[in-house]
Amino acid sequence: MAKKVKSKVDTINTKIQLVMKSGKYVLGTQQSLKTLRQGRSKLVVISANCPPIRKAEIEYYCTLSKTPIHHYSGNNLDLGTACGRHFRACVLSITDVGDSDITSA
């Protein structure tokens, strides 16, 4: 039987779910910008259909605070679902990774 190969989306989804269970995070653009300004954010995940003006602002603050950015390949509904929520989320800011190794992704 052939080996089942996980896609990159599946692995990032499982890492996000592990952060939701064991780490600390913030959902939303305004709260994510707040954690970036305070320097508490370890990783920022941006959905593919995030508005360009918001994406540019978040990327600007990420470069100032030297925070890595991950561009999520799914839309904001997919990112919200990966976080275990039933609503859309354009931006996810991870402040404590917990047991996950998402920062090495």
UniProtKB/Swiss-Prot annotation:
GO biological process terms, semicolon-separated: translation
Highest taxon in the source lineage: Eukaryota
A GO molecular-function descriptor: structural constituent of ribosome
Protein name per its UniProtKB record: Large ribosomal subunit protein eL30
Protein keywords: Ribonucleoprotein, Ribosomal protein
Sequence similarity: Belongs to the eukaryotic ribosomal protein eL30 family.
Keyword set includes Ribonucleoprotein: yes
Gene Ontology CC annotation, any one: cytoplasm
Matches recorded under Pfam families: Ribosomal_L7Ae
Ribonucleoprotein as UniProt keyword: yes
